[in-house]
């Protein structure tokens, strides 16, 4: 009953359409899982809608933008809101989980490209350089205080990309 109540609330919460991209992504996964668990296709459909909105925030290179205002636009100085750390520890792991949960091969490849792009910001010892991220104020050397970590996302995608498994291990060793 609690999951059904939470899913009903999340399904109609319109803030996901204008807030930071990580909420679109994590809620798309929540909607997919709720739809499967409760056998309610409309939750899964809402998950697909949110996933599509989130994918609009991926650049051609694989950089995830949208962690700030304006989510899908430019600041007065022409900048995009980016949070590398949160992308690596929250958004991309949730998106790769969604891809595997839905068995979406195209999405798996898209997310792997994004994961690979974001690895440019992982230091040799596994730390993530989030010095310019929109949430850099709550970043520690080993990661964020409010995200799940990059390990699950990189490990899920490591089957064809051994470098992902190595990155996850290095990051885990910092803890």
Q: Which residues does each PLM region occupy?
A:
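Extracellular polysaccharide-recognition and catalytic grooves
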Residues: 5-175
């Amino acid at each position: 009953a609690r999951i059904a109540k939470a899913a009903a609330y999340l399904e109609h919460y319109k803030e996901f359409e204008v807030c930071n991209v990580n909420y679109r992504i994590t809620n798309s996964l929540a909607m997919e899982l709720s739809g499967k668990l409760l056998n309610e296709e409309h939750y899964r459909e809402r998950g697909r809608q949110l996933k599509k909105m989130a994918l609009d925030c991926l650049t051609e290179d694989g950089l995830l933008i949208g962690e700030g205002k304006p989510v899908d636009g430019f600041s007065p100085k022409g900048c995009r809101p980016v949070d590398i750390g949160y992308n690596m520890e929250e958004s991309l792991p949730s998106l790769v989980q969604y891809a595997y949960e839905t068995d979406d091969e195209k999405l798996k490849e898209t997310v792997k490209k994004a994961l690979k792009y974001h690895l440019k910001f992982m230091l040799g010892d596994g730390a993530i350089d989030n010095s310019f991220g929109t949430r850099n104020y709550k970043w520690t050397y080993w990661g964020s205080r409010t995200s799940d970590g990059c390990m699950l996302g990189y490990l899920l995608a490591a089957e064809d990309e051994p470098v992902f498994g190595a990155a996850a291990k290095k990051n885990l060793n910092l803890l």
